[in-house]
Amino acid sequence: MKEYYENKVAAVTGGASGIGLAVVEAMLEMGARAVTIADINEDNLNKHDSRLNAQYPGKVQGVKTDVTREMDVKAMVDAAAAFGGGRIDLLFNNAGLGLAGAFEDQGNKEWDKAFAVNFFSVIYGVRAALPYMKAQKGGHIANTASGIAFVHFPYQSMYAATKSAVLGLTDSLRFEYQDAGVRFSTIIPGTVATAIWDGGPIPDSAITPEESAAGILKGAAENKRVIFVTNDDREGALNMTLGALGHSILEPAIGEYLLGVARARRSGNFTAI
């Protein structure tokens, strides 16, 4: 796997914390030539830009990026390509929001923000990177979705909708651009102990950002269509698919399971999964 990342030019949105930062650090450890950290949190961005440049001189740059603004994303990708000598090999559209709550409590303003951060940011990144990758006849765009794109947990309809959209978009683009040499992968990163939980209780099954990043980068190097970092997510996707096809045992079991989650969350236990 190390050889895949040697001398690569990469950009990572949401790259100054959590999974994104772990992906940045792992690529640098494996010999990436130029890595752009894109993030809206300027304090985190400056801190990790300085720290990593001290460790990997001249191989890291931080670019403040609001992923809900297409001009910001394009400027970031252009800066990443310039930093890499006119090319970009890898784009990780990783920035996102964790979302939960009752459907009736969420208005159009909340839905607009959810899709702006979790979905349209991915479109903006793809649009900005494609011209470079098509011209160089190669590249890889990996978009972060979630296991909820397969297992649609109640009281997370907004999150399920946005991440399902990312999965569908990425899967379609993978085959649309395969002959142009551009790879697309959907990342299912697992339940990860990051700031996305915003001070709430973290499930016992959560893995570390570093563990998630290792699985992500292995899957990308192997050009996986869908990168399942954990077996839990892989099995959940399989069970939901078989259930939807009418599996006589799985379908009622899945229904009972998700109904149980709904009831637990309705009573205030949002770590119920």
Locate predicted features.
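Active-site helix of classical SDR
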Residues: 126, 162
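The beta1-alpha1 cofactor-binding region of Rossmann-like NAD(H)/NADP(H)-dependent oxidoreductases
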Residues: 42-43, 64-75, 108
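Substrate-binding pocket helix/loop in short-chain dehydrogenase/reductase
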Residues: 102-103, 107-112
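SDR active-site lid
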Residues: 174-236, 242
